[in-house]
Amino acid sequence: MTNTRKTHPLMKIVNHSFIDLPAPSNISAWWNFGSLLGLCLAMQILTGLFLAMHYTSDTMTAFSSVTHICRDVNYGWLIRYMHANGASMFFICLFLHVGRGLYYGSYTYFETWNIGVILLFAVMATAFMGYVLPWGQMSFWGATVITNLLSAIPYIGTILVEWIWGGFSVDKATLTRFFAFHFILPFIVAALVMVHLLFLHETGSNNPSGLISDSDKIPFHPYFTIKDILGALLLILTLMILVLFTPDLLGDPDNYTPANPLNTPPHIKPEWYFLFAYAILRSIPNKLGGVLALIFSILILMFFPLLHMSKQRSMMFRPLSQCLFWILVADLLTLTWIGGQPVEHPFIIIGQLASILYFSIILLMIPTISLIENKLLKW
């Protein structure tokens, strides 16, 4: 008798995606982050749903409704901090997932990669709008500063900003629409994830060597399901340590002050996971130039397949490219640090140098080194 999981119309899809899926036998722990991102998304949707049951998207009551969740709702504090720190875990997994893709040349799967970059943009938009909802000082001023950047667009900029605001400043209309978008976007992200997986399963997974692994495949279950469960347990452990011991470690103290349009905080900065892009934005003195650099700092990921000059797919056997990759990682950490610092000497010049280095490594150095490595192969 044929197994139900192989014949049932719905079970069949699950079976081909998570059970009988042929996976390369040598994929390392770096391939765990896809499933961890799925776990993060599910957790964020679930905790977000429970928060939305008690939250009010009104400027007069938003801040106090978050306080009410933390003080009066059963385990409200836990749900709130799981949601806030869950976003941080989400971005840690995202950055590691993207980094893995860059290191092992997974970007040669064009469709999967480009959908992934669109997903990154969608998650960043979701996180930004979520940060505005508690209506603290940093929520309000973060929303004001970031939305105001659109006014740099020639001719239609000012009209566009006022249209997004729903008035002449960030106010009730802005908060309400941000809440609506913050609620709907994760479901759009979930739909895009399905498309991401659809394209991935057309080609099959990449592996650390970057070689075709059709001759050496093993079933996803039980080998990689058990491996993913281990990753999930470590993720939950890290998250719960963060939530239960230092829930405000990654937050901003200014957000415990209710939003006040008449009082600007001394240092306006976004959450830590946006600091690298914020540093690139601030490093350019021109407003429009800064906005373009900000967008391009993420959009540049889409150009990686075009910039791939090496005869080898993965960086596993390319020590020179490996050096550049880790310099790029160090550069991104430097940008993250600079994004959280005030705009004064020596941080300005460090930020500018780190921004130049970021684009130089990706656009010039990696392709050049790849060509040199191709030459070295002939020796």
From Swiss-Prot:
GO annotations of cellular component type: mitochondrial inner membrane; respiratory chain complex III
Entry cofactors: heme b
Spans traversing the lipid bilayer: 33-53, 77-98, 113-133, 178-198, 226-246, 288-308, 320-340, 347-367
An example Gene Ontology molecular-function term: metal ion binding
InterPro entries named among the record's database cross-references: Cyt_b/b6_C (IPR005798), Cyt_b/b6_C_sf (IPR036150), Cyt_b/b6_N (IPR005797), Cytb/b6-like_sf (IPR027387), Cytochrome_b (IPR030689), Cytochrome_b_C_euk/bac (IPR048260), Cytochrome_b_N_euk/bac (IPR048259), Di-haem_cyt_TM (IPR016174)
Main location class: mitochondrion
Note on how the cofactor is bound: Binds 2 heme b groups non-covalently.
Compartment(s) of residence: Mitochondrion inner membrane
Pfam families per the UniProt record, alphabetical: Cytochrom_B_C, Cytochrome_B
CDD domains (alphabetical): cytochrome_b_C, Cytochrome_b_N
Residues that bind a ubiquinone: H201
Keywords tagged on the record: Electron transport, Heme, Iron, Membrane, Metal-binding, Mitochondrion, Mitochondrion inner membrane, Respiratory chain, Transmembrane, Transmembrane helix, Transport, Ubiquinone
Gene3D superfamilies according to UniProt: Cytochrome Bc1 Complex, Chain C
PROSITE patterns: CYTB_CTER, CYTB_NTER
One GO term (biological process): mitochondrial electron transport, ubiquinol to cytochrome c
Record-stated family: Belongs to the cytochrome b family.
Function field: Component of the ubiquinol-cytochrome c reductase complex (complex III or cytochrome b-c1 complex) that is part of the mitochondrial respiratory chain. The b-c1 complex mediates electron transfer from ubiquinol to cytochrome c. Contributes to the generation of a proton gradient across the mitochondrial membrane that is then used for ATP synthesis.
Miscellaneous field: Heme 1 (or BL or b562) is low-potential and absorbs at about 562 nm, and heme 2 (or BH or b566) is high-potential and absorbs at about 566 nm.
Protein name: Cytochrome b
The organism of origin for this protein: Notocitellus annulatus
Lineage: Eukaryota, Metazoa, Chordata, Craniata, Vertebrata
